[in-house]
Amino acid sequence: MLVPARGVEQILVLGSGISVSSDAIQMADDLGVEVVFASYYGKPLARLIPASLGGTVRTRREQYYAYNDSRGTDLACSFVRGKLKNQASLLKSFAKKWKGQKEDLWREFRANSSRIEELIPRLDLIKGQVELVRGEIMGVEGMGAEIYWRTWARLIPDDWGFPGRDYPAARDQINSLLNFGYYVLEQEVWAATLYAGLDPYAGFLHADRPGKEKLVYDMMEEFRPLVVDRVVVSLAKEMRPGHFQDDCRMTKDGIKIASSAFYGRLDESITYREKRQILRNIIRSQASAAATFLRGERPCYEPFTPRW
């Protein structure tokens, strides 16, 4: 299949034994297209970044300064606030389907959605340098995660034997799907931070670790429920045990199905801020919004929280 070069936003080289010509890499650089090399199961291994995406000095300088002032804490709280709101929204969206039919599930999902939302005001009370208050912020996120994953598990057919969210290893098929989806989301957020001129390694919510893109992990948080978790619920009904190997990694056919679903989700359009927008573009807009906040060009960072 031929694809117009100017219509390509990212090249993903998945698996081993695949070569990319130097001419193709040169063209990708000229067009500002990132080339990502990933394992057969989607885990990123290396990236070729176009020279033009090095970022502006001012944006990155302000990003580093923000770690030691209120902006760092504001951003970290905003990322968690967005995640909690979207977790609650996802549970509410599934609860609607059961109203009048499965009242016990409807009440359970509505109640737990409200419990997650009730955690959000706690973030408004957290002040101070992010290094000192990170534990408080992550504590709020953790309380929400406990409620969310326990409830979300009810959406997965019993046949899969989903044991709950497993960090970071995947010893079952559903966690394998979640991890694969997060790898896909990670590539998209990584590209968005580069286009916005940000340093993907200098985060706020997640503590620094050599070689880990902590700002990417930060900015993924608000998108996880609606870009990945929602898709996995659908895949759990579409896929079969035969799409997985004995070690719970997907087969080639399984990867094709999962890839199509996750990338298809990124290309979906939703109503956000009173207009139809593609999710992939919203991710880039959010990265740009974070950059403008850090530069002092907007008073706050508003996380992605669409209405359902």
Per-range role (PLM):
Residues 2-3, 55-308:
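Active-site helix-to-loop segments that bind/position phosphate- or nucleotide-bearing substrates
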Residues 5-19:
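Extracellular/luminal Protease-associated
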